C-alpha cells in the first residue's frame, strides 16, 4: 500500500474516444502497462498527492456499511463497488473502489483484492469478508463489521474527550500561575519595597522563584526541548512504550478508562469473529493486528502462545493479569457450554457500558482533586501577593 501512487491520466481509448481517469500504480512504468492492458493510449500523466486522512477507520467503515446496504438491495459486489466509486467525493477513494471492482472482474476474490490495501482495510476487514464469502452472508458480515467499527470509534472518541478535560484545566492553571508570577506579583513587591522593609518569607520565596524562572527561562525552554526530543526517541522503542503503558494503567480513573477501552475492543472483535465462525486463535490475531499499543500486542501474543500450547482460553487470559475474575469466569463458562461467542459479546457490552459511564462521570470524579490542586496553587500565590499589604500598616507606623 505504501508504495502505491495515485495517477491521473488522459488518453485515447481503443475506439478512438478521449477519456480521463485515475489509477493506482507503483510506478510510471507499471501505470503505462496497466493502461496498455485497457487499450488506452496515454496523452498525459500526472501524479496526485494522497491525503492520508482519507484512510481513517471511520471512512473505511462507512464504505463497508454502504456496500452492505447495496448488497442487501440485490446489487452484485462489483456493481456495488462501481456505484460507490461514482458517488464517493474523494478522488483517491474513487480510484481505490474502481481498482477493487476491476480486480473482481478479473476473478479475484474480494478478500484477496483487499490484501494490498491493509492500511485502509486492516486484517479484521479481510477476515470478516473472507468469512462472508465462504458462508454466503457477505452483506451480514459487512453490516456487523461496520457496526462494530462505529461503536469502537464512538467509545474511543468518548475516552479521548474525557481525558482532555483534566489536561485543559491544568494547562489553564499553569497559564494563570505564570501570569501572576511574572506580571502581577512583581508590581506588588515593587510597591512594598519602597517602604524599605523586608518582604514576608512566603512572598520573598515566590519572588525568588519568579526571578529564577525569568532569568533562566532559556534554560527551562532548552530543558523542555531536550525532554521533548528524548520522549520522541523513547516513543520509538517498544520496551519504553510497554513500560509507559503499564504506568498509565496504574493511574486511578484514567487507567480504568484506558483499560476499559482496550478490553472493549478486544472482546468486541473476538465476539464478532467467533459469531462469524472464525477460530479463536484467528480472532486473537485479528485483534492483535488492530492494536497500536505494544503492551497489549505483547499480551495478545502471549495469549496466542498459551492457547497454541494447549491451555484453555480462560487460563491464557488469566496469565496476562489484565482480565478481571468476571471475564475469566464468563469465558470459562462459554468454553464449557459452547456459547463462547455469547459470553464474549456480553463482556464487550459490559466493558463498553462501564467505560462510557466512567467517561461521562470523569469530570465529576476529578473535579474535587483538580479544584484542590489549582485552588491550592493559585490561593498560595494570592496570599503571597497580599501578605505585604497586610503588613503595610505595621511598616507605615514604624516609619512614623
Curated annotation (Swiss-Prot):
Membrane topology, as annotated: Multi-pass membrane protein
Lineage: Bacteria, Pseudomonadati, Pseudomonadota, Gammaproteobacteria, Enterobacterales
Superkingdom of this protein's organism: Bacteria
Location in the cell: Cell inner membrane
Keywords of this entry: Cell inner membrane, Cell membrane, Membrane, Transmembrane, Transmembrane helix, Transport
GO biological process terms held by the UniProt record: protein secretion by the type II secretion system
A Pfam match: T2SSF
Species in which this protein is naturally found: Escherichia coli (strain K12)
Annotated protein name in UniProt: Protein transport protein HofC homolog
Membrane-spanning parts: 165-185, 209-229, 370-390
Any one cellular-component term (Gene Ontology): plasma membrane
Amino acid at each position: 500500500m505504501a508504495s502505491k501512487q495515485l495517477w491521473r491520466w488522459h488518453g485515447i481509448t481503443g475506439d478512438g474516444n478521449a477519456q480521463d481517469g485515475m489509477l493506482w500504480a507503483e510506478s510510471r512504468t507499471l501505470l503505462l502497462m496497466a493502461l496498455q492492458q485497457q487499450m488506452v493510449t496515454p496523452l498525459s500523466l500526472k501524479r496526485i498527492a494522497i491525503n492520508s486522512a482519507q484512510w481513517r477507520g471511520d471512512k473505511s467503515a462507512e464504505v463497508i456499511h454502504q456496500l452492505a446496504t447495496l448488497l442487501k438491495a440485490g446489487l452484485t459486489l462489483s456493481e456495488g463497488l462501481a456505484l460507490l466509486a461514482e458517488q464517493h467525493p474523494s478522488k483517491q477513494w474513487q480510484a481505490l473502489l474502481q481498482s477493487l471492482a476491476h480486480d473482481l472482474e478479473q476473478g479475484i476474490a474480494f478478500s484477496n483484492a483487499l490484501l494490498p490495501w491493509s492500511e485502509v482495510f486492516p486484517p479484521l476487514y479481510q477476515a470478516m469478508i473472507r468469512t462472508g464469502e465462504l458462508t454466503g452472508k457477505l452483506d451480514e458480515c459487512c453490516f456487523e463489521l461496520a457496526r462494530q467499527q462505529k461503536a469502537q470509534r464512538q467509545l474511543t472518541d468518548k475516552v479521548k474527550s474525557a481525558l482532555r478535560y483534566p489536561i485543559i484545566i491544568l494547562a489553564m492553571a499553569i497559564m494563570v500561575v505564570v501570569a501572576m508570577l511574572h506580571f502581577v506579583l512583581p508590581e506588588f513587591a515593587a510597591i512594598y519595597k519602597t517602604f524599605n522593609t523586608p518582604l514576608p518569607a512566603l512572598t520573598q520565596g515566590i519572588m525568588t522563584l519568579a526571578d529564577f524562572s525569568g532569568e533562566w527561562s532559556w534554560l527551562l525552554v532548552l530543558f523542555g526541548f531536550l525532554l521533548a526530543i528524548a520522549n520522541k526517541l523513547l516513543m520509538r522503542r517498544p520496551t519504553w512504550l510497554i513500560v509507559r503503558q503499564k504506568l498509565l494503567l496504574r493511574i486511578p480513573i484514567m487507567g480504568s478508562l484506558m483499560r476499559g477501552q482496550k478490553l472493549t475492543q478486544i472482546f468486541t472483535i473476538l465476539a464478532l469473529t467467533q459469531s462469524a465462525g472464525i477460530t479463536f486463535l484467528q480472532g486473537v490475531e485479528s485483534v492483535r493486528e488492530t492494536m497500536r499499543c505494544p503492551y497489549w500486542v505483547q499480551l495478545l501474543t502471549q495469549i496466542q502462545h498459551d492457547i497454541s500450547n494447549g491451555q484453555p482460553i480462560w487460563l491464557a487470559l488469566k496469565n496476562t493479569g489484565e482480565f478481571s475474575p468476571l471475564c475469566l469466569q464468563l469465558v470459562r463458562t462459554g468454553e464449557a457450554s459452547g456459547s463462547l461467542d455469547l459470553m464474549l459479546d456480553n463482556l464487550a457490552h459490559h466493558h463498553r457500558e462501564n467505560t462510557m459511564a466512567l467517561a461521562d462521570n470523569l469530570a465529576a470524579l476529578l473535579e474535587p482533586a483538580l479544584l484542590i490542586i489549582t485552588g491550592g496553587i493559585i490561593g498560595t500565590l494570592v496570599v503571597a501577593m497580599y501578605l505585604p499589604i497586610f503588613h503595610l500598616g505595621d511598616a507605615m507606623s514604624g516609619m512614623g
